[in-house]
Design a protein with these regions (language model features):
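Short acidic-glycine-tyrosine-enriched beta hairpin
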Residues: 51, 78, 89-110
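Short histidine-centered beta-strand/loop micro-motifs
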Residues: 58-60, 68-73, 90-93, 112-115
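Glycine- and acidic-residue-biased ligand/ion/polar-headgroup-sensing regions
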Residues: 63-64, 73-90, 96
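Ligand-binding loop in jelly-roll beta-barrel domains
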Residues: 96, 105-136
Length: 174
């Protein structure tokens, strides 16, 4: 779940320990331990944490009917649908396997996996900058904030609780 108060953001690595080179991240959609709980019926699997832009890249898995709270992005977002059906309540389109989306910053929307999705949705999201969650879609006030640092901490906490090696996440920090 996103943070609701701020403190000094730090990726926890010693100076010089963060790799600057290119890399690959191998995901395993069948390994349930790697899925980090994010919201009711929604999980993420991390691919990259960009501490320069405070962005992050994740696989998002959502069960039919699951939704994320209304939010907007302070940077652009790119997404690619691998399986399942999903949409934003505020739009008429439905994303299906093969759908690519590009979101400019600043539009409030609510991600919903459609009730009639034939399987859980699996979406690759590349998020530049943070997300601002709102308490309601009409004239919403600030409810929570999410970015690469808070996503990293959420993943670290899950890895510790699941008995996974937290250092695996350090390799995803750029």
């Amino acid at each position: 779940m996103p943070i609701q108060s701020f403190n000094s953001a730090n990726d926890g690595l010693e100076s010089g320990a963060r790799s600057r080179g290119h890399f690959i991240a191998n995901t395993d959609v069948d390994n349930e331990k790697l899925w980090v709980p994010y919201a009711d019926g929604v999980w993420i699997q991390p691919c990259c944490f960009n501490v320069t832009s405070v962005g992050f890249s994740v696989l998002l898995k959502g069960l039919p009917g699951a939704q994320l709270g209304v939010h907007y992005h302070v940077g652009t977002v790119r997404g690619y649908t691998i399986q399942g059906h999903w949409r934003y309540l505020e739009h008429d389109w439905v994303a299906k396997p093969g759908t690519f989306i590009y979101e400019p910053a600043g539009e409030a929307h609510t991600l919903v996996v459609t009730d009639d999705s034939p399987e859980p949705a699996l979406i690759m999201f590349m998020v530049e900058g943070g997300l601002i969650y709102l308490d309601n879609p009409v004239d919403g006030e600030f409810a929570a904030y999410e970015d690469g640092f808070s996503a990293l901490e959420l993943c670290r906490s899950h890895y510790r609780d699941a008995g996974l090696d937290v250092k695996l996440l350090d390799a995803l920090i750029r």
